[in-house]
């Protein structure tokens, strides 16, 4: 009987190990760059270009590649980091970052009169309204957006059009929405930059080392349940 039990347990372990190996992420790698130094060292679970064929030239729409990668990391609340190497990525549509997931690029602090460098997400939308449900990036609880820039190529500062928020803290229908983080990010010509959801807010929002040229409002925090942290905001 003991031998049969041991054989049964061994078989279960073998199945479990096999299942994990079939579902393991891509090539884990340290995110280290002399050209784009960071305050910390990240570990990439997936790389959006090599693992999901996103186009870093900005010619092809990369929205599906990004969302597929983010959803993969969010499966079973596994979490992880999606690394977005330096380049320009055209995004025609909305992105959702699931709980426990970080989207991380390569970034330099902007310098007046110089071009933005590093990872640039290009919002390929004509705008026209400011509806929260159409936010460019919506973040669920315990997520992070770090080391990248977001640019609105169709926005004209001389003829400003309303756009939905660039980053929305709090996804409708998801309870909580605590601990959303934006760190080391540049917002180029956002109409509304970082907004805590007016309909489904949360607590403990974090914003650190953010630069930008918002055209209506940079950060809007209301309907908050717990204290947040906001440091080094440069608008």
Regions found by a protein language model. Give the residues of each.
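Extracellular "leader-to-stem" segments immediately downstream of a signal peptide or signal-anchor
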Residues: 1-85, 90-158, 163, 181-183, ...
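Extracellular beta-strand/beta-solenoid scaffold signature
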Residues: 66, 116-137, 147, 157-174, ...
